[in-house]
Regions:
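Histidine-acidic metal/acid-base catalytic patches
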Residues: 19, 55, 60-67, 73-178
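Active-site acidic/histidine proton-transfer and metal-coordination neighborhood
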Residues: 1-64
């Protein structure tokens, strides 16, 4: 799998990357290869997720979406919206069910949209907070996706935060029969 951060609006993609992706789509058809486009937070993207729209347009089993939970929070904070209000405008449940293949799962502790290693993509502080975020993603049809913890560490030698995040996520999955 190839994960690609994509900073294009659909109007730009149609003029640039879509012709290339259409060729790649033909080459990859019938293979297990996936190109996974990750959402990023763009100022132009207030009410639609461009990478979901891109994958809807391409309509290929080989080209899917990765939703990064931290990017959702950063974008909501930039627009001064709570996460539920933002997701209601940004994500379409049916499109998510069809197009989201993978989730980058971690916590964001700041409320300004700024990426700081100490506050962005960190371990959830507790099981309740993790459950809240996981429930949001499941509500939008993403429970059957690949969930990848993506945690910044204080100490990359021990990976203690990552291990704790995986433990809490495993408890959530077991409790909710996912």
């Amino acid at each position: 799998n190839i994960v690609q951060h994509t900073r294009l609006l659909m109007s730009q993609a149609k003029l640039s990357i879509i012709p290339v992706l259409e060729k790649a789509k033909k080459i990859m058809k019938g293979t297990n290869t996936k190109i996974v486009f990750e959402n990023i937070y763009m100022m132009e993207e207030q009410k639609d997720c461009t990478v979901i729209n891109l994958c809807e347009y391409l309509n290929s089993e080989n080209m899917k979406v990765c939703i990064d939970m931290c990017h959702l929070y950063c974008q909501a904070h930039i627009y001064k919206k709570n996460i539920e209000e933002f997701l209601e405008k940004y994500l379409d449940k049916e499109k998510c069910k069809r197009q989201v293949y993978q989730i980058h799962f971690a916590y964001t502790a700041n409320e300004d949209g700024y990426i700081d290693r100490r506050t962005h993509a960190i371990m959830h502080p507790d099981q309740e907070t993790l459950n809240y975020d996981a429930n949001l993603l499941c509500e939008y049809g993403m429970k059957d996706c690949n969930w990848v913890t993506e945690v910044s560490e204080k100490d990359y030698k021990t990976r203690e935060d990552e291990a704790n995040e995986i433990k809490m996520l495993s408890e959530y999955i077991e409790k909710n029969n996912i």
